[in-house]
C-alpha cells in the first residue's frame, strides 16, 4: 500500500478547464498548476496591507485600480521573504530543472519560503528526502505564522493566503509518511488539515477516506463520507464498498453500487482486467476511462483484497449491463 502525490498537477483537487467536447468538464493533471492562480491574490493582499476601506465598494475599486494600473504586474516587494515567494509563484508555472533551480534561488533569497521546500520535495525521488524537505516546509511555515493563528482561524484556514504554503507542506508530508508506512502520522496530519479547513479546498478527504478504509476503520470512514455531499467515482464506489463491508448485500448497498455504475461504468472493467491498459492521459474526465483508471490505481486493491466484494461487483455489474442493453441497446451510451 502506498500513497502517491496527488494534488495540483496529479490529483483530486481537480484544477479544471472546460472541454468543448460534448460539454464535459476535463481536468488537466500534469500541464497546469493551479497554484499559479494565487500569485495575483497574494500580490493584492500585499498591496492592501495596512489600508482601511470604509465600504466593500471602496475595496473593490482599489482592486480594480491595482489590476488595471499595472500595480500587480510591476509589484516589487522590499522584504526578502516576499521576493522569494514571488519567485516561487513563477516557479509553479515552470517544469523540470528550471522549476527546481528557481526554488533553490528562492531559498537563497530567503530561507523563510515554505513553498520552495514543497517544490523541491515534490521533485525528489527519495522518499526519506521528501519527508525531510516537507518537514522543513512545515517547520518554516509554523515559524512564520506563529501559534495564535491556528486557533484564531481554525475552520477558515485556507481562506488566508499566507497559510496555504503550510497546508501544502503538511499535505505533502502526509503522503510521504504514508509511503513510508507511518500511517498513524499520516492520518493525524490529514485529520488536522480537515479540522483547520473543513471546506477542504485541497481534497485531503479523498486521501483520508482511502486511509481509513485500508486500515479497516469503517466507523471513521462512514463518518467522513457523511460529512461531504460528493459525486464521482472515488466517493461513489468507496461508499458502495463500505456499505458492503459493514452491512453485506442490502438494498442500500445495491443502490449505492448502481449509483457508482452510473457515475463511471469503466471502473468494473478495469478492476476485472477486461480492458487493456489505458494510455497515459493528462486529464480526468468524470464518467470516462481516465477517471476510472485514477480510481482503480488508488483504490482497486480495496476491492481485490475482499473476494466477496469483488464477486458481488461482478454479479451486480452483469445485471446492470443487461438492463442497459435492453433499454438502450448499447452498454455505454450517454
Give each language-model segment a name.
Residues 66-70, 75-76, 241-334:
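Long, ordered, amphipathic alpha-helical scaffolds
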Amino acid at each position: 500500500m502506498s500513497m502517491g502525490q496527488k494534488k495540483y498537477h496529479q490529483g483530486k483537487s481537480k484544477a479544471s478547464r472546460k472541454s468543448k467536447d460534448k460539454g464535459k468538464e476535463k481536468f488537466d493533471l500534469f500541464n497546469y498548476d493551479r497554484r499559479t492562480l494565487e500569485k495575483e491574490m497574494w500580490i493584492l493582499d500585499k498591496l492592501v496591507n495596512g489600508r482601511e476601506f470604509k465600504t466593500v465598494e471602496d475595496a473593490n475599486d482599489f482592486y480594480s485600480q491595482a489590476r488595471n494600473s499595472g500595480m500587480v504586474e510591476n509589484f516589487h516587494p522590499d522584504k526578502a521573504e516576499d521576493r522569494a515567494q514571488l519567485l516561487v509563484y513563477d516557479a509553479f508555472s515552470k517544469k523540470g530543472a528550471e522549476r527546481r533551480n528557481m526554488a533553490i534561488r528562492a531559498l537563497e533569497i530567503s530561507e523563510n519560503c515554505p513553498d520552495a521546500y514543497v517544490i523541491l520535495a515534490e521533485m525528489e525521488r527519495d522518499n526519506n528526502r521528501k519527508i525531510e524537505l516537507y518537514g522543513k516546509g512545515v517547520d518554516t511555515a509554523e515559524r512564520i505564522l506563529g501559534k495564535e493563528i491556528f486557533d484564531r482561524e481554525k475552520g477558515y484556514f485556507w481562506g488566508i493566503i499566507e497559510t496555504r504554503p503550510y497546508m501544502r507542506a503538511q499535505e505533502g508530508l502526509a503522503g510521504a509518511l504514508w509511503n513510508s508506512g507511518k500511517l498513524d502520522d499520516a492520518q493525524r496530519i490529514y485529520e488536522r488539515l480537515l479540522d483547520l479547513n473543513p471546506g477542504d479546498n485541497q481534497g485531503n478527504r479523498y486521501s483520508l477516506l482511502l486511509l481509513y478504509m485500508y486500515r479497516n476503520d469503517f466507523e471513521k470512514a462512514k463518518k467522513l463520507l457523511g460529512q461531504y455531499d460528493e459525486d464521482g467515482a472515488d466517493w461513489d464506489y468507496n461508499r458502495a464498498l463500505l456499505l458492503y463491508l459493514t452491512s453485506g448485500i442490502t438494498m442500500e448497498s445495491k443502490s449505492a453500487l448502481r449509483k457508482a455504475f452510473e457515475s463511471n461504468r469503466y471502473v468494473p472493467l478495469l478492476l476485472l482486467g477486461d480492458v487493456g491498459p489505458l494510455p497515459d492521459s493528462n486529464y480526468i474526465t468524470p464518467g470516462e476511462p481516465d477517471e476510472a483508471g485514477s480510481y482503480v490505481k488508488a483504490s482497486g486493491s480495496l476491492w481485490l483484497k475482499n473476494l466477496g466484494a469483488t464477486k458481488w461487483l461482478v454479479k451486480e455489474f452483469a445485471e446492470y449491463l443487461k438492463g442497459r442493453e435492453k433499454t438502450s441497446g448499447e452498454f455505454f451510451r450517454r
